[in-house]
UniProtKB/Swiss-Prot annotation:
Cofactor(s) it depends on: Mg(2+)
EC numbers: 6.1.1.20
Cellular location(s): Cytoplasm
Protein's name according to its UniProt entry: Phenylalanine--tRNA ligase beta subunit
Gene3D superfamilies xref list: 3.30.56.10, Bira Bifunctional Protein, Domain 2, Ferrodoxin-fold anticodon-binding domain, Nucleic acid-binding proteins, Phenylalanyl-trna Synthetase, Chain B, domain 3
Keyword match Hydrolase: no
Superkingdom of the organism of origin: Bacteria
Domain B5 stretches: 401-477
FDX-ACB domain span: 698-792
Organism expressing this protein natively: Legionella pneumophila subsp. pneumophila (strain Philadelphia 1 / ATCC 33152 / DSM 7513)
Length: 793
């Protein structure tokens, strides 16, 4: 944003130097990148009037001029500009004048003719990069007045780099508000005249997509003076704001934008067919823009259209098919509020940049449109004449930003900054910003935010404003004063830490994978589940939220196995996402897998592949470390697991997870030539609320008894163990181990032989043979009743 110091002083009468103002604005968060003079350094250049001209006798391109400088005698000037003519007010560099670039004007003869000065162009005075002919001044310019004084050239432009949240400062008015509150000065309100309609002409405005444009104001002005030109004072202010002059009506639009912050647009009324429609584009529609670029629209681009065609990309750039030109006599003025979300990104998508889009995508004041339209009307009528129609306003209150009001806790200023600022000082600073304090209760302010401050939404925003205006330099380094309370670690966090350390100690590598997974892989593993689809995925291979931990682990395993890793031991702790009746639920899980050769090369033993029992044994050790006693592995089927090598894991009577070998069908699909053993558990099922108690080691002897029997093949060792544990008195059974399983010759086809070893011990006395024999007899009888076992001798 480029801001003229003199223009700014019309709104707030400050006395700061350029350096002081730049430093003050920068410290307040409006970073000033540069401060530049508005014109080059020159002296003795005055306003003059060309009285008469005649051709140079010896040069076709030179003209002899008599120039009035409000002295006794006119001066003789030789000029080479094509636009010099009698009656023209010009900029005359007198003899002795110094111009930018080091040029000094002296009396001289050009082709034999006396020249007592030089008629200057805007380029020669450093007022423009390019210009044609000499500078033409207003007919009312006072002859003899110093040009610097007449054009107020002893001015500087501040180039301010605004942060995205400060959309309110994209205008002279916005910056003036800041300067006023920073210096505790009143803002000089510039009255806006309400122009009464002279004609009844209007256009119908249809807000077809009012969510994108909730307010649209317009006005017709007829019978413009085609000879009118933009006044020099306005052209100068536009130049200082970084905008070139084009046409009186267009220049007024840009001037109001710089002054008030409301971007506007003017259409040639003769090129509008019937009505104004604010709608989204139709895919394939084409529009030639004002810069000559032709764009193909789509249904994400908001356009201003008439009955038959688009006229402009809303809030970004107008179309050439409705542009105001030199012969335009009737215009339709637009002043609208566009939803920032609608405009944001569209300009960049099309490679466009405009002052309008820059303001609209950051947010303009939603209450400014009619005021800006009245201001523009007043200026156009004063410059180009014409007859104005009534203001047309269409709006949809449902989509207009509402008034922001909330209860501000002033104690947060000290909590967040450490500064103790008096309540009255806070109140003055907030009111200086235009914040209305409706009510004060203790340390609370009930506040209403002005409509132009779209960035103020909560307590923290007001704290920032207060400290910004109070002065960041008043923030002193000081020790933090706060109470420190040790954080509590949840049971789930403790379990996760324990499990992670335990698996790492067992030689497993922890993986961390995306929560987004490949739909093809996930659906192969969990075909019965519903999955949460991502609306905007990183890629099509990461377009679903994981419903289990296996997809990420298997993907990591495949990656490593294809890179000559002969042994893979992975585990991962993470969150999975279940869809239950359309509701998304999260749960924490631990999962792991084994694949490849167990152990390193060793001369004393041959290598073997990991199997189901390696992983089961690791899990049993984990459960023992967590003091989980009620754990069962119940043979069951899972779509992703081998039908004969899979089991549910039941902890404390509740289903908690799965263990098994990857289904051969999936191993083939993933091009794996070795078994993959994997498990998954709900992390919360590992939480054991029982507090472990100290128990001394028994000093009494242990007694071992072995049993061998035939049992149906479908009976598992765990079922047998459960019956035995329920039969043995109290806690005599210290260990239960299966040391032999045999199926084959000498055993019926539907049977298997199982041999188990039991260790019995009492903690308070020595067990006698009679007690042991009674216990063994009870076990055998119970097993015979439950499973029809046949005891082997």
């Amino acid at each position: 944003m480029k801001v003229s110091k003199l223009w700014l002083r019309e709104w707030v009468n400050f006395s700061l130097t350029e350096q002081e103002l730049a430093e003050q604005l920068t410290m307040a968060g409006l970073e000033v990148d540069a401060v530049n003079p508005v014109a080059g350094q020159f002296t003795h250049v005055i306003v003059a009037e060309v009285l008469d001209t005649k051709p140079h006798p010896d040069a076709d391109k030179l003209t002899l001029c008599e120039v009035n400088i409000n002295k006794d005698k006119p001066l003789k000037i030789v000029c080479g500009a094509a636009n010099v003519r009698p009656g023209l007010r010009v900029a005359l560099a007198m003899i002795g004048a110094h111009l930018p670039g080091g040029l000094q004007i002296k009396e001289s003869k050009l082709r034999g003719e006396l020249s007592q000065g030089m008629l200057c162009s805007a380029t020669e005075l450093g007022l423009a990069e390019h210009s044609e002919g000499i500078m033409e001044l207003s007919d009312e310019a006072p002859i003899g007045m110093d040009l610097r004084e007449y054009l107020a050239l002893d001015d500087h432009v501040f180039d301010i780099d605004l942060t995205p949240n400060r959309a309110d400062c994209f205008s002279i008015l916005g910056v003036a508000r800041e300067v006023a509150v920073l210096n505790k000065l009143p803002l000089i309100e510039q009255p806006i005249v309400t122009v009464p309609p002279a004609i009844d002409d209007g256009l119908r405005v249809n807000l077809i997509h009012s969510e994108a444009c909730p307010r649209y104001c317009g006005r017709i002005i007829r019978n413009l003076n085609l000879e009118a030109k933009t006044p020099l004072w306005m052209a100068e202010r536009l130049r200082r704001g970084g905008i070139r002059t084009l046409h009186p009506v267009v220049d007024v639009m840009n001037y109001v934008m710089l002054e008030l912050g409301q971007p506007m647009h003017a259409f040639d009324l003769a090129k509008i067919n019937g009505e104004i429609n604010v709608r989204y584009g139709v895919s394939g529609e084409q529009l030639e823009l004002l810069d000559g670029q032709e764009v193909v629209l789509n249904d994400n681009v908001l356009v201003i259209a008439d009955k038959e065609k688009p006229l402009a990309m809303a809030g970004i750039m107008g179309g050439a098919n409705s542009a105001v030109q030199e012969q335009t006599q009737h215009v339709f003025l637009e002043s609208a509020y566009f939803n920032p979300v609608t405009i944001a990104g569209v300009a960049r998508k099309y490679g466009l940049f405009s002052d309008s889009s820059q303001r609209f995508e950051r947010g303009v004041d939603p209450c400014l449109q009619s005021k800006a339209l009245e201001r523009a009307t007043e200026l156009i009528l004063s410059i180009s004449g014409g007859e104005a129609g009534p203001v047309i306003e269409s709006f949809d209150k449902k989509f207009l930003p509402g008034t922001v009001s909330f209860l501000f806790d002033t104690t947060k200023v000290k909590k967040l900054t450490g500064l103790s600022i008096p309540l009255n000082e806070m109140k003055n600073l907030l009111e200086g910003l235009g914040v209305v304090i409706i009510k004060e209760t203790n340390h609370f302010f009930e506040v209403t935010i002005p409509s132009h401050r779209v960035d103020l939404q909560q307590d923290a925003d007001l704290v920032e404003e207060i400290i910004r205006l109070y002065g960041y330099d008043k923030l002193q380094a000081q020790p933090m004063q706060t109470s420190v309370q040790a954080g509590l670690i949840s049971a789930k966090e403790k379990i996760a830490t324990h499990v992670s350390s335990w698996f790492s100690a067992k030689g497993y590598h922890e993986t961390i994978s995306y929560s987004f997974v490949d739909p093809e892989l996930q659906e192969a593993l969990y075909p019965q589940k519903e999955f949460m689809e991502l609306l905007n995925p990183i890629s099509s291979e990461l377009s679903q939220m994981r419903a289990g931990m296996w997809p990420g682990l298997i993907a990591s395993m495949i990656y490593n196995s294809h890179r000559q890793q002969t042994a893979v031991k992975f585990f991962e702790i993470g969150v999975v996402f279940d869809l239950d009746g359309g509701q998304l639920k999260e749960r924490s899980c631990i999962a792991g897998l084994l694949m490849g050769e167990q152990g390193n090369l060793n001369w004393s033993e041959s290598a073997r592949l990991f199997d189901f029992y390696d992983l089961k044994g690791d899990l049993q050790s984990l459960f023992a470390s967590l003091k989980l006693d009620d754990v069962e592995f119940i043979q069951s089927s899972h779509h992703a697991l081998h039908p004969g090598q899979s089991a549910q894991i039941v902890i404390n009577g509740k289903h908690s997870g799965w263990i098994g070998v990857l289904h051969p069908r999936l191993s083939d699909a993933f091009d794996l030539d070795q078994d993959v053993v994997l498990f998954e558990l709900n992390l919360e099922s590992l939480i054991n609320p029982t507090i472990p108690l100290y128990k001394p080691i028994s000093k009494y002897p242990q007694i071992r008894r072995d049993l061998s029997f035939l049992v149906d093949r479908q009976i598992s060792a765990m079922q047998i163990e459960r019956v035995i544990r329920n039969t043995v008195k109290e806690d005599w059974l210290k260990s239960f181990d299966v040391f032999d399983v045999y199926m084959g010759k000498g055993i019926p086809e539907d049977k298997k032989s199982i041999a188990v070893a039991m260790t019995l011990q009492d903690d308070t006395r020595t067990l006698v043979d009679a007690e042991i024999n009674l216990t063994i007899s009870a076990i055998i009888k119970k097993l015979e009743n439950e499973f029809s076992i046949l005891l082997r001798e």
